[in-house]
Amino acid sequence: QQSGLDFISTPASEDWVVPLSELCDALKIASGDIDFAPTIKAAADSALPVIMSTGTAEIAEVDSAVALFKSVRKAEVLEDHLYLMHCVSEYPANIVDCNLLSIPYMRERHGLDVGWSNHVIGPLACHAAVAQGAKLIEVHVTDQKEGREFRDHALSFEPHEIFDLVSDLNSISASLGLLQKRPTLSEQQNTRAFRKGLVYSKDLESGTVIEDKHISFA
């Protein structure tokens, strides 16, 4: 809180939702609970935003979980109430298995912001996820990778890497712009210099009727 960061936690069961709600700014539903109605209902019954991870889930299971949440939260629009996280539950995950197009797919299907829960070694999948429209990025963090045996350390980020990752992701997000095509203000000054113009192909006497053969482009 002193650093201005939101505190988010995952209830291990429905019994943990109420006590965690008193401490947290948001709750997260783990991938393993995508089909566990008691925890989803309890989280939806809270007043907090909920982040729902979708690792191992079929799209029909995601549909059911979203519908269950909506039926309990009773919000006409779920935006700002529920966020989905695309996730590949492998440790580490291979980048060719990421299927990051699931991010825009679920966004369009459910009308919700979708994020990426990263288990790929390195920042590349996170970069690509933001380029696909991910609004949240979740990564594992460790104080030290070297010499650690547990699987999560290899795919985790050390503190100095987090600063670089956040900087890169902010730059990528800023580069996306709007869903349109128009010249930027900075490049509009170059339009005339980049386009071709009409010139005479040779010197002409006064009164000459201009024909195609007299014209060149440069």
List each language-model region with its residue ranges.
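Catalytic cores and adjacent flexible loops of soluble metabolic enzymes
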Residues: Q1-A218
